[in-house]
């Protein structure tokens, strides 16, 4: 039983490690594969193997005097390693200068007294919020005054035209009434009084013209045309026909 249990445990462990291996990403690199973190500043580091490390013995190298060695020995660095080592130094110097310029500009911006936009330009700047949708434009009092003046002028013009037209109608009625009176004088004496009553009715309508407006203008014309027609008929009609015509009015 103990043998079988040990075999089962080993088999379970193998299965567990196999499953973990399958779950791991295939393209993942081991953290020790990238050795750049071991040597962040390769120029300042002194090799523990002396001036010529054993892994660079077969590589052609150029001797560079090392200022950090007090004994006067020279450390040799390969061109490839020298090129790789010079890159981070340049990047570091560039970042330091960039940081210095950024800090200087930031400090100058902080110590500079703030001046509002209204002080610089001398004008009050108002920010308008964007319209969320189509809205009707607002009418200011300055824009409303010309509109009111235009309405007043239009109203005055309409009133003047109405007054002029009223005068024209009154003049026409006076003229036609005078013609009607001339026609009445030519009528028979018996029916002249009745025709004069109709003429008097026209004069009363003339007086009411200003108060009633233009509503009775058509009735004036209609009454005048009828009276004129009757007057023409009364000239050559007999007494019986005149009586019938007057009664029909």
From Swiss-Prot:
Polar residues bias: start-end ranges: 66-79, 92-119
Protein name per its UniProtKB record: Uncharacterized 27.9 kDa protein in trnR-minE intergenic region
Record's GO cellular component terms: chloroplast
Subcellular location(s) of the protein: Plastid, Chloroplast
Highest rank taxon of the organism: Eukaryota
Key words of the record: Chloroplast, Plastid
Region (Disordered): 66-142
Organism: Chlorella vulgaris (Green alga)
